[in-house]
Design a protein with these regions (language model features):
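Extracellular ligand-binding interfaces
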Residues: 114, 129-210
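C-terminal cell-surface anchoring/sorting signal
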Residues: 1-22, 272-292
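Terminal, low-complexity interaction segments
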Residues: 180-265
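Short carbohydrate-recognition loop motifs
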Residues: 64-103
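Extended extracellular/luminal ectodomain segments enriched in beta-structured repeat modules
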Residues: 116-125
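Extracellular glycan-recognition surfaces and repeat-rich motifs
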Residues: 25-26, 34-79
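Short beta-strand segments enriched in hydrophobic/aromatic residues
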Residues: 85, 128-130, 148-150, 235-237, ...
Length: 292
């Protein structure tokens, strides 16, 4: 009877986990219980911290920047990734990286493996939130970055960098909404600008009068061998003033396979205990029905 009880509990747990596995969204939990994480670094040298073993990292944090999965701005659950930069020199990001290593202990994190060829990327989407207490310029909000190695050879690092998506470059004069969640999608028609990649800052690859209007499709054609080494959502630097907000629900589609991540705060021990009791109760009910 005891072994059967164990098997029923295990089956219940597997059932719950399987429901999450086959769902479209993977939940990444904070390192700490509510109110969650708050990683900060007052130094000018960037530092990072792993979010468990999820492949996500609080990264590039410096000059008082703060980031962490917290309960401040819950979205599709009990949490999201809180972000704050108190000055133009501050920075804070969250990144998904391929088998990342740290530059030191502590240190910043960087990718050592590729995620996929850039040419196979179909789209990326994410949700962001700007608190009305933010004093930075009105068009600023958490940006989306696709991290790349331009020639596809990860042994040469001088061509690493990223493509950046911001609303202001898509829509002209723009004021970011406040105190509400905004979901936006990047696809082949979206305008993106670059940093790094061996071609300088905001390179005008399509030779138009505007250096920020190269589409994702044009970037794919310009770098046919480029590989994706990470996805980034973050703030700064160079944002004069204070920014307070959050990001959540990043999703990318590569060759028809969509990966979505929802960030949540790890349940309190009492919540987990109640969850366990619920599983035990369900298993006990099955046993009683079987005995009857």
């Amino acid at each position: 009877m005891r072994n059967l009880f164990k098997h029923l509990v295990a089956a219940a747990v597997v059932g719950v986990l399987s429901a999450n596995v086959f769902a479209a969204t993977t939940i990444v939990y904070s390192n700490n219980p509510a109110p969650g994480d708050l990683f900060s670094n007052s130094a000018s040298t960037s530092l990072g911290q792993a979010v468990g073993t999820s492949g996500w990292y609080y990264n590039n944090v410096r000059n008082g920047g703060k980031v962490g999965i917290r309960t401040n701005y819950p979205f599709n659950g009990n949490g999201s990734v809180y972000m704050r930069t108190p000055s133009k020199d501050a920075k804070a990001d969250i990144e998904f990286l391929g088998n990342a290593l740290a530059t030191g202990n502590p240190g910043n994190f960087y990718s050592v493996t590729a995620i996929a060829p850039l040419k196979h990327l179909v789209s990326v989407s994410y949700s962001w939130y700007r608190d009305s207490t933010s004093s930075v310029a009105g068009h600023l909000h958490p940006v989306l970055r696709i991290l790349l190695d331009a020639d596809g050879d990860l042994n040469t690092v001088g061509d690493r960098g990223g493509l950046v998506w911001e609303s202001v470059y898509q829509l002209g004069p723009y004021t970011a909404p406040t105190n509400t969640w905004v979901t936006q999608t990047v696809d082949d028609n979206s305008w993106m600008w670059n940093y790094g990649l061996g071609i300088g800052f905001a390179a005008n690859i399509n030779s138009t009068p505007y250096a920020y209007d190269a589409t994702l499709a044009e970037w794919k054609a310009y770098f046919p061998n480029a590989v994706i080494i990470g996805f980034n959502m973050g703030l700064g630097s160079g944002w004069t003033g204070d920014f307070v907000g959050a990001v959540d629900n990043i999703s990318w589609t590569i060759e028809g396979i969509t990966t979505t991540t929802n960030f949540e705060v790890v349940p309190e021990p009492t919540t987990m205990a109640l969850f366990g009791l619920g599983l035990l109760g369900a298993a006990g009910g099955l046993l009683r029905r079987k005995s009857a």
